[in-house]
């Protein structure tokens, strides 16, 4: 028989689960009419950091952990911003922080200390990464042994070091990828080889279409295009998704068209729009650190660095060793706003600004690209004109 029941049921979970239940279960919204969506982040201000420090102390007491000194608390706050990839925000999800505190307390106990210091918080973070970085170590070994080809010095035409992020669930890391471009006269446009073999996702393909539109609008606004070009991620055997490499792909194309070598000591990340603006991307810290690790493994020269979108500067929460190398001028992080900024850094040649007629200064990168594309277009039109002087279509001996 039915039993009388008067209760309140409260569900806690991820927002996307709530959205799915509301979409697929018609009774769910009737049963759970009041929804509260808690934000997982908050602004990082002096006041919020004080509140955060109190919360850390409360968590330590609740877990019966040793107290943290001020430097340890500061390191936990830094790590919180790092988890969000935003130095202006703090994570409100306490479970991740509690795990760090427990492990830091363990290291303090092993050393016989009554207080958790910054050293033990850092050791907790480092050991958590070490337990999960087998794949990263394997990829770095492949690069070190020359199995995976990545240049970090010298110059190459039509070749740029792009950067990607591999997400293993509980650990993310960045890795460089060689992006190459080849160009010739033709009418096939820019061919994305990843898309042709169904390894490139829709967002990546969108990025290639955007850079194709940028090329045509900037350099040949009133002439038919006569370009056949190919873009590929070398030694890539899995799916590629996202548009964060579209600027690197565009730089490879510009280098090939201008016949201008690109510095291999600089890696690139950032998406591009049709106006040539460089747009922000995700995983900026992991990408910088991924290229830094390769350069550091081979020896830092002071000439190496990474180009990032200027709008990503507020997201920088780099590892301490990377920050130290930047401070000592042994490694650089360049923030750019436009395609022109990036191509000048990579080639050392001025990009050049157009005049009222859309012509770029002689000797500039943009002028060299413009001349190559105009040559292709004029040559293609001359071939078409010669063909039209022959027999009309349909003439000749019937079969």
Predicted regions and their residues:
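AAA+/SF3 P-loop NTPase mechanochemical coupling elements
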Residues: 1-13
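A glycine-rich phosphate-binding loop feature that marks nucleotide/adenosyl-phosphate handling sites
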Residues: 8, 75-79, 96-100, 119-127, ...
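Hydrophobic/aromatic beta-strand patches that form the interior of the parallel beta-sheet core
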Residues: 10, 34-36, 307, 334
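Short hinge/gating elements
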Residues: 14-17, 33-44, 54-64, 81-90, ...
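Conserved C-terminal "switch" segment of AAA+ ATPases
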Residues: 20-95, 110-115, 221-226, 259-265, ...
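Generic, well-ordered alpha-helical scaffold segments in large soluble proteins
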Residues: 31, 55, 59, 75, ...
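C-terminal helical "lid" subdomain and adjoining coupling/linker elements of P-loop NTPases
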Residues: 62-68, 81-152, 353-358, 380-387
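Peripheral, non-AAA+ core regions of ATP-driven protein-machinery
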Residues: 183-199, 205-399
């Amino acid at each position: 028989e039915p039993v009388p029941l008067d209760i309140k049921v409260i569900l806690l979970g991820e927002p996307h689960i709530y959205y799915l239940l509301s979409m697929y279960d018609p009774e769910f919204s009737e049963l759970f009419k009041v929804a509260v969506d808690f934000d997982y982040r908050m602004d990082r201000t002096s006041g919020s950091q004080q509140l955060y420090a109190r919360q850390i102390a409360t968590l330590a007491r609740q877990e019966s952990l040793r107290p943290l000194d001020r430097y340890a608390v500061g390191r936990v706050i830094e790590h919180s911003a790092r988890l969000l990839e935003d130095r202006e925000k703090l994570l409100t999800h306490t479970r991740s922080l509690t795990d760090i505190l427990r492990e830091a307390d363990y290291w303090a106990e092993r050393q016989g200390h009554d207080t958790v210091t910054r050293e033990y918080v850092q050791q907790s973070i480092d050991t958590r990464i070490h337990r999960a970085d087998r794949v990263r170590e394997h990829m770095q070994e492949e690069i070190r042994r020359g199995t995976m080809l990545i240049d970090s010095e010298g110059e190459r035409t039509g070749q740029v070091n792009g950067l990607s992020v591999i997400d293993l669930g509980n650990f993310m890391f960045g890795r460089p990828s060689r992006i190459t471009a080849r160009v010739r006269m033709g009418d096939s446009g820019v061919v994305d080889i990843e898309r042709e073999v169904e390894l490139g996702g829709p967002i990546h393909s969108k990025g290639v279409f955007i850079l194709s539109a940028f090329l045509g609008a900037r350099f040949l606004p009133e002439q038919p295009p006569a370009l056949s070009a190919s873009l590929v991620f070398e030694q890539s055997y899995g799916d590629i998704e996202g548009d964060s490499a579209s600027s690197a792909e565009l730089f490879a194309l510009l280098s090939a068209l201008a016949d201008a070598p690109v510095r291999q000591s600089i890696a690139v990340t950032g998406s591009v729009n049709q106006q040539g603006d460089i747009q922000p991307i995700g995983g900026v810290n992991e990408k910088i650190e991924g290229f830094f690790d390769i350069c550091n493994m081979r020896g830092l020269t002071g000439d190496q660095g990474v180009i990032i979108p200027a709008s990503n500067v507020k997201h920088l929460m780099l590892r301490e060793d990377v920050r130290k190398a930047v401070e000592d001028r042994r490694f650089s992080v360049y923030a750019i706003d436009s395609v022109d900024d990036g191509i000048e850094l990579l080639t050392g040649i001025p990009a050049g600004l157009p005049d009222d007629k859309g012509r770029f200064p002689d000797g500039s990168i943009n002028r060299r690209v413009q001349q190559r594309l105009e040559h292709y277009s004029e040559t293609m039109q001359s071939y078409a004109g010669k063909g039209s002087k022959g027999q009309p279509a349909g003439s000749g001996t019937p079969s």
